[in-house]
Structures are given as structure tokens and as C-alpha cells.
């Protein structure tokens, strides 16, 4: 079964940790408040509970060509635990399995640029530097 499709000009935020509903709601509220325009398609589906990168890559590779998405942002235990809600960005297309973290503060910029193909996943992943967390260009 393919991953859920994000709404037009948004990216998919997929919940994989179901241990704290209040934390998920706080993350969704932070996403809603991070930008004037909707930039996320949040999905809370228990079938993705504990899903790892390899499982998501397998699901996506089984999808039809017109159902594939290029990246997904995971709301895993790490994202739900911290006040910055550092989502795990996962490349599903160019370098499948490549990841970096992105605090919600930076998510709207990344989502917008990826959804219109203004920038690509690798540019953000490269800018994440040794910490593995994107905090803007040249600020890590």
C-alpha cells in the first residue's frame, strides 16, 4: 500500500510514534502556527506505528509511479519529545533513505521549496552538517 498522498503544495508529516497524543497535537499546532499557509499534510494512522525507514522505502517502492512521493517527514519519538519537534526528513526518491532532522521552525521553508522543486532534498541534508539537524543555511 503506498504512503498517503500529501495535499497539493504540502509535504507529508507521518506519525510513527503513538505514545503521547498530547505531544502529537502540540506538534500539529506548531506546524499550523509555523507559517501563514498550510505546508503540512499530517497523517496519524496506526498502521505506521513504529515504522522504520526501510519499511517506508519498501511501501513507497511498491507504489505506482503516479502515487510515489519524493520525501516524508516523520513524527517519531524524538520529534514528539522535544520542544523544537525535530521531524525526521527522509528522502524517498533521489537518495532513498537519506535523512536529516528539521525543527518545526524551519519546516515551512523546506516544505515550500521541496513541493515546488525550487530546491532539492540533498541541499537541505548537506546544510544539516555534522549535527544532522537543519538550522538554516550557514547557521549550524
Predicted region positions:
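Short linear, low-complexity motifs centered on an aromatic residue
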Residues: 132-140
Amino acid at each position: 500500500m503506498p504512503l498517503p498522498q500529501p495535499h497539493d503544495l504540502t509535504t507529508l508529516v507521518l506519525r510513527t510514534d503513538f505514545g503521547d497524543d498530547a505531544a502529537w497535537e502540540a506538534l500539529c499546532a506548531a506546524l499550523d502556527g509555523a507559517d501563514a499557509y498550510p505546508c503540512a499534510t499530517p497523517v496519524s494512522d496506526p498502521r505506521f506505528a513504529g515504522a522504520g525507514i526501510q519499511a517506508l522505502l519498501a511501501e513507497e517502492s511498491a507504489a505506482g509511479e503516479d502515487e510515489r512521493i519524493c520525501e516524508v517527514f516523520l513524527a517519531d519519538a524524538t520529534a514528539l519529545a522535544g520542544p523544537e519537534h525535530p521531524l525526521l526528513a527522509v528522502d524517498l526518491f533521489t537518495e532513498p533513505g537519506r535523512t536529516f532532522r528539521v525543527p518545526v521552525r524551519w519546516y515551512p521553508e523546506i516544505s515550500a521549496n521541496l513541493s515546488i522543486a525550487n530546491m532539492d532534498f540533498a541541499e537541505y541534508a548537506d546544510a544539516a552538517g555534522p549535527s544532522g539537524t537543519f538550522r538554516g543555511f550557514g547557521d549550524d
